[in-house]
Amino acid sequence: MEEERKIEELQRLIDTHENIVFFGGAGVSTESGIPDFRSVDGLYHQQFAYPPEVMLSHSFYESHPSEFFDFYRRKMVALDAKPNRAHRKLAELEASGSLVSVVTQNIDGLHQAAGSKRVWELHGSVHRNVCRGCGAVYDAAWVCSREHEDGRGVPVCPACGGPIKPDVVLYEEALDQDVLEGAVTDIARAD
């Protein structure tokens, strides 16, 4: 009963507002089979050779690229994940004109896969992997294909041989200022 009341209240808020901004994180994508970080089944409660916050740091990417990409491919990229009801409902709200934008901490790209157009990805996206040499961009499937690797399992750019870095914000890195400013601007317009 309590959950039903909350859903009705949420629907009332949606129906009575015109400039909605949705701010979400890992919980939105768990129904799509993507684990969060802090729940009982989350990444922080699983056993790895190093803690996840270490493996997802910039210094670990630099010093242990093979282990970084092994973890990244196995635990951060979910090529088979599909948008769930929440992703689809948000895209529907955007199409109706009620939703200004989605601000997300998720890196899975499921909001866009559901049809959302204005998505501020605070932590980046696994679907963009950038050559640090020439700036070429490769998708997640390319990184997971293992077609272009050095001898350590680290993806390298076929155009220039430069190392690839996922366009995700790692520990020790700052958020993208343009993304942050866009999200703050939209949030300030929300009613």
Stretch-by-stretch model annotation:
Residues 1-191:
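Conserved catalytic core of sirtuin-type NAD+-dependent deacylases
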